[in-house]
Swiss-Prot record:
Name of the protein this chain belongs to: ATP synthase subunit delta, organellar chromatophore
GO molecular function, one term: proton-transporting ATP synthase activity, rotational mechanism
Example of a GO cellular component annotation carried by this entry: proton-transporting ATP synthase complex
UniProt subcellular location: Plastid, Organellar chromatophore thylakoid membrane
Amino acid sequence: MPLLNSIATPYSEALLQVAEARGESEQTANQVKELLQIWESSPELRNAMTSQVLEPEAKKAALMKLFSEQLTPAFTNLLKLLADRKRISALEAVLLRFLELYRDIHRIALAEVTSAIPLNEEQKELLRKKIQVVAGTNNVELKLLVDPSMIGGFIVSVGSQVIDASLAGQVRRLGLALAKLG
C-alpha cells in the first residue's frame, strides 16, 4: 500500500487544497464518501474503470456521464485527471487519503463502531457523545458496521484505542479474571 499511498497523496492533497480554497471541502468530503460507497458496492464500475481495454477517453466520458452533475468542479477535474493519466485504478486510495487529510485538518475523529445489530439514532447519539470524551474532540464521524456474529454489544475503534463492549469481550475478560484467581 505504500506505493499506492505515494501515488494517491499528491492527488488527494491537491483536491483538498482546491476544495478548501473554494469553501467546498465539506461538500467535497460528502461527495467523496458517496462515490466511495458506489465504487465499493459496484464491481462492474470498478472493473470497467480499471480495465486496460477501455481507453482513458472512454473512461473519462463514462465518469462524466455518471457523476459530473453531482460533483463539485474540483472533484470532476480530479476524475478527469486520473483518467487522463491512467491512474483511475488508484481512485479508491485517492479518495480514502483525501478523507484522512480532511479529517486531520478539521480535527475530526473517525470512530469505527461494530455492533451485532444496527444502532438506532438514540444509540448513535449516545455513543457519539461518549466517543467525543474519549477522542477529546467534538467532531466525531461514526463508521457503522454490523457483524451478526458478535451476538451482542459493540466494539469501538478510535485511532489506536479500542473499546470492547461486546459480549465476547466481556466473557473473555471474565475468563481472564477467573484465571488470575485460580
